[in-house]
Every structure is written in C-alpha cells, then in structure tokens.
C-alpha cells in the first residue's frame, strides 16, 4: 500500500518516486522531533527547510539540519545530552549507519546517517543516498530569526489534491507545526 501511494503521488506530482519516499521519511523524522518536549529549542534550518517549510523550490535533499536555540546557554554536558535526546527521538525506528568521515558526535555537534526501510530499492543512481537520511544537529549556530511553519509530506499533499483527505488521517500523515 505504501509503495502504491509513493508511485501514485510521484505520477500526480511529477516527482521521482525515490524523492517521494525520502520526503516521507524526512517528514516522519521532523514530526517525531516536533513531538519532543524540547522541540521549542530545535530549529529546522538549511536547504531542506526552505523546500519543506517555506515551499521555496523543490529541493530534494538527504539531510535534516537542526540548530539548538540558545545553545550557548547550555552548561556542561547539557548541550550534548539535549542533542543526543533529540537525535534519538527523531530517528526512532531507523537504523544508524556509521559512515567513516561522516559520523561525528561531539559535545555541540551531531552528524549521523540513518537508513530507512526503502521499498523502491537502491539500483537507481541519484544525487541523494537512496534509503538513507543524514541528521545534523548543532548548538553553535545562531538560528534567529525563525518562524513556525506547517510541514507535511508529498504523499499527504497528493491525498489532499485528489480529495482523499480521509487517507491523511487514516495513515497518520497530518501536517504539524515546526
């Protein structure tokens, strides 16, 4: 059923299926982060946020960039603990893939690759890693100003545009504020 939704959304929106699938997993991770009690400190930023939140261009990226607001005010190990907690919660159910030269987990910076259950396969060469998400979180960027925006996935947009709103709720694809 998921594969059918990905392929139908791909055809309707004229976006390659691998990007529809990756968008679902990026949006899922962001939704998990938004449900975190510390989500008010986690600011979605970078190129992917321009596409997902601000609807500027169709950027198909593999990374989720997060900045911790007021990171300089976190004393001692609190920054690292907060970053680790947010990363763990937003990647729930995904498998970390340790990549030499990519994976980095410092006191103020976290960068790790995660694999998701890819239903479309890995045979197609793409500009992004099929079946993987890169999560980057830091507490030294200055994420100001920022504004909360509604986020949803391409599959939900497809369901909405084809008058299938009931499927959005049925499959838990409701938009959320971040």
At which residue positions do the language-model features occur?
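Short, compositionally biased low-complexity segments
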Residues: 1-6, 56-65, 129, 161-168
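Helical scaffold of the NTase/Pol beta-like nucleotidyltransferase catalytic core
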Residues: 1-43, 82-86
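Glycine-/proline-rich flexible loop or hinge segments
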Residues: 8-14, 64-74
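Short, conserved acidic/polar surface loops in the N-terminal third of protein domains
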Residues: 53-57, 76-81, 146-148
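Metal-dependent nucleotidyltransferase catalytic core
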Residues: 68-104
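Active-site nucleotide-donor binding segment shared across nucleotidyl transfer reactions
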Residues: 34-64, 69-70
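Short, low-complexity, polar/charged sequence segments that are solvent-exposed and flexible
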Residues: 62-64, 85-88, 153-158
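Catalytic cores of NTP-dependent nucleotidyl/adenyl transfer enzymes across multiple folds
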Residues: 8, 27-31, 95, 99-178
């Amino acid at each position: 059923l998921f594969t059918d939704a990905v392929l139908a959304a791909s055809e309707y929106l004229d976006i390659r299926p691998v990007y529809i699938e990756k968008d679902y997993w990026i949006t899922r991770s962001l939704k998990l982060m938004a449900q975190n009690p510390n989500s008010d400190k986690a600011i979605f930023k970078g190129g992917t946020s321009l596409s997902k939140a601000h609807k500027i261009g169709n950027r198909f990226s593999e990374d989720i960039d997060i900045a911790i607001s007021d990171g300089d005010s976190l004393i001692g190990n609190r920054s690292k603990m907060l970053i680790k907690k947010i990363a763990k919660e937003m990647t729930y159910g995904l498998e970390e893939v340790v990549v030499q030269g990519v994976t980095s987990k410092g006191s103020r910076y976290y960068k790790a690759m995660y694999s998701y259950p890819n239903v479309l396969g890995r045979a197609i060469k793409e500009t992004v890693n099929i079946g993987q998400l890169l999560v980057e979180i830091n507490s030294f960027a200055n994420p100001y100003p920022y504004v909360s925006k509604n986020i949803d996935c391409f599959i939900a947009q497809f369901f909405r545009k084809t008058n299938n709103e009931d499927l959005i709720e049925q499959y838990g694809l409701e938009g959320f504020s971040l």
